[in-house]
C-alpha cells in the first residue's frame, strides 16, 4: 500500500537533514520571531533591527552545524532484500559488473550522499518497473513491495526524505501512480486530501481584487503576483508557496488599494500629467535663462497654466467622486483620534471586505494595537491606511485554507468546516468566492453531508454567473479572447489538451499561405489567436450539450470557422450582406470613385480587407473595381456574425481579421463559399487532436514534432510516463535534405538506448504526420530546402507559399498500452489512432485522473481509488456527462475530508 504524504497545517515545521534542515529551521525561526500573531506584518517586523541581529547570529550557528556531517548509520541489506537482489540485480550491478556504474554490493560502504543518491535511483527504477529490463525475468508484486519497503526504511534510518517520493507530488509525475491499481477496486482505504493551505490561482486573485475595489481594479493597475507554470496540462497545484516576489508585489498592491479605499490621491494616478507638467516647466526654465524673449515662451506659460488647472480640477473631481465607506470616513474626517469602538468598527469592516469574515480575537487585538500606534505617529488617515494594508498583507489573502476544521471521524480524517467547504466549492466551479446561497449555507453550518454539497454543486453547474474572459493572454490590440459562462470546465480542457499554447509557437508568415504584410492583419499570429477562440467555442458547445463529452471532443468532425456560434445571427447578417453588396455594385456604376470610397469604405474594409484608414490611391481604386465587378458572386462571402456600425472610426473586426486562417483547414478563403450554419463537417478531421490549434501547439517553429505529439498521447490519454531526458543526450534531429522528418527522426532514435523511451512516443506521433506544422492536411511532405525549390512565390499577395519538391508520407503508427488487445496494434493514420483511443476505457479513465488533479489541486494517491472509480461510473451511467464527473469529484471523500 502506498504511503501517503503527511502534510501538517504548518509544513514549514517539518525539518529534514543537512542544508534543507537549516533552511527549514531558519524559516520556522523567522516565522516565530517575526510573526508571533497572525495580524503582524513584515512592516512591523523589519522595524526591529535587534531581531535581525539575533537571526544573523542564529543563521551563522546553524550553517556551522550543517557543515558538520557525522557518519550516518549504516544501511543494512536484509537477507530477504539480498535474496531479491541476487535473483534479479547482482548479475549486472555487483562488485564485478557495474552497468550504469551501479554497485549494489558497495551500498552499505558508501558515504551518506552517495548512498542517498543510489537509494533514490533504486526506488525510482523499481517503482516504475524499469529495472530489471523488460526482456529479463521480473520480480513479483510481493518482491517489489519488499524492496520498496526496505528503501523507505533506509531513508528513515538516515533521517532523510526520498527525492523520488517527493517529486511524485509534482504535476508531471502524476502518472507514476499505478493506473491499474487505481481502477481495480482492490484499494479499500478511505480517501482524503492532506490538510493544506493552497495558493490561489491568478484567476481567483483577479476576482478577489474586483470584489474589493470593483471596476477600479484596472485603473489602480493592480499587479497579479500569481503565476502558473507555462505547460500543457493541469497547472494549478497546491504545492506552491508564496515567496519574496509575491510580497513585494502585494506591498505595492496593498498601498494602491488602501489609497483607493480612503480616496487618497496617489501620485501614480496623475503620473503622466505630472510628467508632462515637469517637462514643460523645465523647458520654460531653460528658455527663461537662455532667451527670456523667446517667442514660444508666452504659449508655453499659457499651456502650463492650463495643464496645472486641469490637474487641480481632476484631483478635486476625484476627491468628490470618491466614496469612502462609513467606518473609514468616521476616522478620516475626525479632527481628534478615534475611540476604540470606532477603530474596531473599521477593522471589522476591512475584514468583511477582504476576507468575508470577522477577525479572530488575536487578529483583532493585533490590528487594534497597530491602528492605535499608527494614528499616534502619523495621524488618522495615514494610520488607518497602515491598518488597511496590514489586513491586505496577511497570508490568508493569497492562500485558500483547507485544514479540515470539522470533527474527526473514525479514520482519523477531519471534514472541511462549512465555511471551508463554501470556498472550496466556489473556487472549484466559479473561480471567485462563495455566492449568497453558499454563504448562507456556511453560516447555518449546512455543508456537512454529500447531499448538501451536491445541492450547491449542481446549482452552480446549472446556473453559472456572467461570462468570463477565459485567457487574458490571447487578446491583442487586434484580437479578442473567448468568454465563457463555464470557466472552470473550459479551462480544464484548455489545459488538458494544451491547444491554447499554439500562439506561442512562432511561424513564418510566408510559409503560412495567403499571408500579406499590409497592416499584418493576415499574419499567422493573428490567425492562430482567432483559431484558439474557435477551438474554445467548439469545446464550450460540447460541454454545454454534456453528452458523450470525451468521445465528442476526440472524434467530432464538426468544427467552427470564422464564426461566433450564433447561427441565427449569421443567417441574418449573411442576407443583409448580400443585399448590401448588390446595392454597392449598383452604386459603383453611378457614383464617382471618391464618393463611393467615402460612402462605403467601412464596408469595403470589413468585407474585403481594403484599409479604411488608408488613402484612396491607385491600388485601392483598382482593388475596388475588381471587387465590384465580381458581384454577384457564385459563392457565399465570408462574414462574421457580428454587426458593424458606420459611426465607429475603426471597425471592431474580431473574426474579420485573418480570413486566410481558413487555409489551416485546407480551405482557400479566396474561393470558399461561407457556411453560415456551424459547426460544419470538415474532411480529414476528427476532434481536437486534428484541430489546427492542437497540431500547432504540438509542433516546432518550422516543422512538425512527432515526439511531442506522441508524448502527449502517451501521457494524457494512456496514463503513461516518459522518463526525463538525460542531460547528456543531444535531442536535435540531424539535417538531411533528401529525407522526410520521420526518416530523420527514426535514424536519430533507433539506437537501443534511445528507443527504450521513444518506442512509447514515436509510433503514436508518426500517425499525425498527415498534418503539417500549421495543422494543414497533407499527403506528401515538402522538402523545404533551396535546392528543392520549384516555384518561388511573392512575399506579398493572396498566395505567398513557395512550392517545393515532395516525398511520399508514411503516416502509419502503432498503438500499445490501451489494455485492450482489440484496440492495440498497427494504425493507418491519426484518424484510425484517434478512433481507437476514443473507444478505450483507459483513455476515459486517464481523462478522469486529470480532472481529479484539476479540481483537487494535487496528484491522486492510491487511497483516492474509490473516488476515481465513482467518477468513472458517474460518467458512464450519465451518458458521458462531464457535469456528472464534477459532481462525483466535488462530493467525494477526497474533496470533503483532510488528514
What are these model-predicted stretches?
Residues 135, 330-337, 349-357, 371-378, ...:
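Second-shell loop/turn segments in exported
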Residues 71-146, 677-830, 834-838, 844, ...:
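Sequence context surrounding c-type heme c attachment/ligation sites in exported
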Residues 94-104, 134, 159-164, 361-363, ...:
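Short, solvent-exposed loop/turn and secondary-structure capping segments
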Residues 79, 83, 138-142, 337-345, ...:
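Soluble non-cytosolic domains of exported or imported proteins
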Residues 1-54:
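N-terminal secretory signal peptides that target proteins for export/translocation
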Residues 72-286, 290, 302, 309-326, ...:
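Aromatic- and Gly/Pro-enriched helix-to-coil junctions and flexible linker segments
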Residues 150, 162-164, 170-316, 337, ...:
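Extended surface/linker regions that mediate inter-domain or inter-protein docking
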Residues 57-67:
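Bacterial N-terminal signal peptides
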